[in-house]
Amino acid sequence: MKTSKASQRYRGIRRNASQCYLYQESLLLSNLDDSFSADETGDSNDPEQIFQNIQFQKDLMANIRCRPWTMGQKLRALRQAKNIVLKFEGRLTRTRGYQAAGAELWRKFARLACNFVVIFIPWEMRIKKIESHFGSGVASYFIFLRWLFGINIVLTIMTGAFIVIPELIAGQPFGSTARKTIPKEQVSSAQDLDTVWSLGGYLQYSVLFYGYYGRERKIGRAGYRLPLAYFLVGMAVFAYSFIILLKKMAKNSRTSLASASNENYTFCWRVFCAWDYLIGNPEAAESKTAAIVNSIREAILEEQEKKKSKNLAVTICLRIIANILVLLSLAGSIYLIYFVVDRSQKLEQSKKELTLWEKNEVSVVVSLVTMIAPSAFDLIAALEMYHPRTTLRFQLARVLVLYLGNLYSLIIALLDKVNSMSIEEMATKNNTSHWIDSTTFFATRTAPEEEKWSTSRPGMGLRRNNTWALEETSISAYTMPLIKANKTSLHTQSPQDQCWETYVGQEMLKLSIIDMLFTVASILLIDFFRGLFVRYLSDYWCWDLESKFPEYGEFKIAENVLHLVYNQGMIWMGAFFSPCLPAFNVLKLIGLMYLRSWAVLTCNVPHQQVFRASRSNNFYLAMLLFMLFLCMLPTIFAIVRYKPSLNCGPFSGQEKIYDIVSETIEKDFPVWFGSVVGHISSPVVILPAVLLLFMLIYYLQSIARSLKLSNHQLKMQIQNARSEDKKKVAQMVEARIQTQEESTKKLPNDSDLTSQLSSAHSGTPQNNGNVAHFDSGSSKSGRIETVAQSMPQSPRPGDRAPSSPLPGVPKSRLEHETNRYLHGLCASTSDLHRNRSRTPMTFTTHIEDVHSEPLFRKDFQQINPPHRGPQASTLLAQGPRPHAPRYYVINECDSYKKKHLNVWPERHFKIDASGDIVELYPRNVRQYASRVPRQPPSPQLSEEEEETPSRDWIKRSLPPRSLIDLRRAPHFYIGERSESQTRDPEHQGRVHYKSWNEDFEGHLERPAYVPRKPRSRNFQYPQPPLKPRGKPRFEPSLTESDSVSAASSSDQQNSSADQYLQVTHSQGRFPRSVGQPSRRKAKSGQELTVDLDDLICSDV
């Protein structure tokens, strides 16, 4: 029966303790029940309230998994929420329902669209794999390549949709006009390899180049203005490139400014927060692991670079030498390219047929220079000893200057040739017009009537392959051949071939093709075959090829990134003269992506110094923007400076290329629009507009600087706030530690408790019969300890010898038990176990639950004094001992403020005549402790105990909020030490504990809480009658605690020698023991007498 009651009480305690933890959730459940019941009755008819309730229920259904409820509660709440939503959602208006449904559908669609778009991001998984194995620096190259691929896709669409496709659809077909027909002398060699390689023959007279497009203002039935579209698209290519570059740079700047600095907790974030727990693929897990390792290596390198010491003088000298070598390399490469271009021009003028090398030597030399020079710069950069990121930027800048120098030297040479071709064309035009205007020459022979002659009609200018029949005679008028006008140009190109725009486009496309071939060759030779050589011949070589020369290749970020910039610069420079060049670049970038990624994953090894790339990559974009600006200048210069070719292109016949705009405005727009455009384009408007733009740029730049400064200040404030927070946390921890140290120092430093304990254990007690009160320093637990002592009048004749162990208990086991920490509930919460320091004394410890073990007195007598050891002290219950002082030590730990009215048992107090407080405990609350054999109690009480007035019962309790608020079990400690021992704070930690039962029962071992069997009611106790004195009083009989003593408590001589060490709490009350029933049945008078007889008198 008691076991069931104990289990019921235990379950009640657990239920009460869980109420505090689930208080918020129970409120939510109760609100849910209330709302459900209110909605069931139909009290809520407000649409707004219904809508809010429905939203609340939907949020609850969405977050039901996160609630700390049981499964039954979750299911019940989910059912109720669904019922409410299904029942009352129809009360809302259809508009609001449609709006909510539409918003939800839009969110779902946007999420699905985002997930769907991610699938179409090209090469995403490939780039992630490369980044995981080679770091963010190598991955930035492939991200940059993918971004350039996107730009070229847009440029291809622009040129293809507005230029190439309209010309193919609505323009004149191939062979219909002279500019779309291959000359007869070139037809035989049009399909030769060298002709195709040099982009001649059929490729020259195709949509690839400028000369194929017609000059008709309108083509097709729709009247599409192809020349105007060609010019506007050419300008739009540069405009779009500028806009997308600036937009990307601004976005990256915002991202880098908005991103939090990860300089704090550098390694903690990488070690503890870097793993992605959504990874379910072993390959992805391997890649993520490699990425984390690389990021840690990057962080380690950053920390090492911060602490690197440098010799300033040597470093400056080495950097000066490195810059001199770089300048010499740049000057040599520029001179070499200019020399090769000039030589090729001279060869074209002096030779009629050129070899394959002579036709392609310019492109080959430029590609060789661009491939070899960056490696030389890489060797030179090793002298400078910069940070790897700074080294990369210097390398990028130098290679950029090299590429720009190569391109500009090439462009200058090409423009010289364009200038010479323009002069020849002008001379040809002037000579032709002179011969036509002066006279007409007749042929020296009569031609057959059916024979057709190539001639020019009078007044039509220079034309070829135009035939017309003479009237009446077969005499044909012809123009003097060009060899008459210029005898030095025997092997000059025909007027149809003198198209400098097509020549520039051919050179740019040829340069791009040869650059691609050299890139493929360098990847195969430098990376692939080198890796094969190192891999398979390292075992047979004289040295280790993998760790020494030539070793495996590393991915060179600087020159590869600059190679992309250089390639895109060639596209921008030649896009106006070759509209299909962006389309070719798209194919080139696709092949480059797959080839480079294969080479990196197969043939390259990670860098020895892996450094973190810039978060924004704005340095790459800045170089690309600079390259765009410099590549736009030659094109703009050619458009403005040179006259378009007369025999090819959509602008033939115009004085300048941009005249097509003014011509279109004059012919296709009203007069007033032309006048407005003329006024706007006048210098009176242009100059103030330019000045206004400069002022606007300056203003925006000032705002940008101020925002940057404020952003820096905000970052510093955040860092200061973080440091202050860390300081506050450190101060709180330090204050807590100091408080604990102070509370620890207070108890051992108190002289009252020390004197009491020393007098209690000394052979000559102090001549003091008063009551001493002591307030414990452990004020955190709300405990006030009172030590009451009654000293004997005469000292003992001799000192006490150390006590010996119990018979039958091994010494090693006893020492082990005395040095063992306490277990159970009090072992984790008691201040006496953890927060207090102790003197190096040997304690015989009585661990008891106040609510389950009655307090009882014992007489202690030494047995076998010569055999007691210094580390253990054993006290045994013996018979009467008139001169031995008796010690009563009662200590309750961790009293709490929170009590429960229906849980804690009532407390009974009495005050005897001497002023001592006596607290009565019923015997039936004890359940756990084992008892020692008891002797029959004394037959009667002392007169002082009989005349002690009783105190009122105290009834105050509060319910426990949680399990930790339950009262801990009080414990009792009886300490013994020699007189010579002092409480040194340095040795307060060496405390030896012994349980009460170990002292008296030897091998008896009991756990902290073991339910004991109920005591038999057959045991008879004397039941003296109660003496009512005014108020109801209870005078209990002699308790079992007095049975240990052979002398009666009425003996004044012995009672005067008793010593009491009392520790009482001031705030808490004893909680009910675990397993006790919470309610007690009403008892009859006889049962009440028996229970009162069972009360145990204890001096507290």
UniProtKB/Swiss-Prot annotation:
Ranges of compositional bias, category Polar residues: 751-793
Keywords, in A-Z order: Glycoprotein, Membrane, Transmembrane, Transmembrane helix
Annotated glycosylation sites: N264
Keyword Transmembrane helix included in the entry's annotation: yes
InterPro entries referenced in this protein's UniProt entry, alphabetically: TMC, TMC_dom
Extracellular side: 170-192, 247-319, 383-393, 530-569, 640-679
Compositionally biased spans, kind Low complexity: 1041-1059
Subcellular location, record wording: Membrane
GO CC entries: plasma membrane
Family from the record: Belongs to the TMC family.
UniProt xrefs under PANTHER family: TRANSMEMBRANE CHANNEL-LIKE PROTEIN 3, TRANSMEMBRANE CHANNEL-RELATED
Protein name: Transmembrane channel-like protein 3
Organism: Homo sapiens (Human)
Gene: TMC3
